[in-house]
Amino acid sequence: MKKLGLFFILLFVFIQSPVLAHDGESELENNKKFNGIENYDVITISQPGVLYYSVTNQILESVNNLESNVTFIGRANIGLEKIIDTSNQESLETNEDYLYSLSIKTIESKYADLFYSNQITELIQKNKIIVSEFTAEQYSINVGDTLVLVGMNEVTSEIEVGEIVPDAELGWFEAVVNKEVGYQLGINRNIQAIIWDNKVTENHFVELYKNIEYKQLRVTFKDAKPNKNWVLPTALVKKYFGDFQIKEKDGTWIIVEPAWRNANIERKNMPIIGRTTCNKIMWEPLLGALNQVMEEGLQNTLSKDEFQKSGGCYAPRRINRFNAGGAISRHAWGIAIDINVKSGYHPRVVQIFNQWGFAWGGTWTSPDEMHFELRDLSPSISQTGS
């Protein structure tokens, strides 16, 4: 039993995970890039979706016992209804009952200077929203503009843009606000705890392990190695595969604006799996992967029956495997596909899909073994010579 207990402690401490999470975010905090946090040893703790309240309280208890420091990062997808420029003119307006979706991070004002410059910290503390460069380009956002946002609580708020910064500075979130503004937007959830101290020792990990009852956590310390099945953050998904307005349907399923859907989504017959509906950009890498599966004699390891009954590619919905804060599934872009929904994949099939630019969900913190997600078009370009 002692050996088994030691094994769980080591697993808890050293488990690694994708730098880019499934709903498109990375942890800037892991990089320890900005003024302040790089002067400390840092532990980050997260779990699929949202940190449970019990986990949050047990982290607080541990940090108190250790006399260390902790802050919590929040995140949710918020609706963008319109943009009002500095001349009080609407520079962007959505269709009736439709919204764009933004992935917004929240941070405690008093700790913002650990991660951001003094200028950005001051703007965050003044209740401004900091927007990433790709997002600003996507929606023609300028400093001083007012974003009209519809929160998770369905309350409409107007927030001024304080600054536009490189996406990496925001950890590939589309925007960041302080916790108070986040609460106004209905973002009451935390996705990550950041613990820091002058020196982290094994006592920190023992204390955390002793107090936190839920063990399916992602814990990183120092330089975490990225999982090979990392995925694109939302800003890059929009840049490479397009963006669309959404209309709520039932909390999970959404309605994608018809103009985008008609221009980007189509139905075709594919080898092995038969008829499917995907983003047009998917056809070349998907066809390449399926053809190679056949060339290597592995076609019988993929189940057309499972795919046709409960698998699929295009599915306009939010992520529903865990509390993902309203994050839009990559299936809504038609760039993810679930084939063997029950029987799993042959390891070589996973390798083939990786080679054709797909990430596989089987190694994520919350495994999604049936899921392949397109993240890179360069393999299909180089292998087809087009």
Across the structure, where does each feature detected by a protein language model lie?
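Sec-dependent N-terminal signal peptides of Gram-positive bacterial secreted proteins and lipoproteins
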Residues: 5-21
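Basic-flanked hydrophobic alpha-helices used for secretion and membrane insertion
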Residues: 40, 55-56, 60-62, 77-222
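Active-site-adjacent loop/helix surface patches within enzyme catalytic domains
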Residues: 292-332
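Catalytic cores and adjacent binding grooves of peptidoglycan-active enzymes
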Residues: 314, 321-386
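Membrane-interface junction motifs in transport/secretion proteins
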Residues: 22-57
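Active-site acidic/histidine clusters and adjacent loop/turn architecture
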Residues: 240-305
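Extracellular/periplasmic catalytic domains that process cell-envelope and extracellular macromolecules
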Residues: 36-37, 123, 186-187, 327-333
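Second-shell loop/turn segments in exported
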Residues: 42-48, 125-126, 269-280, 338-344
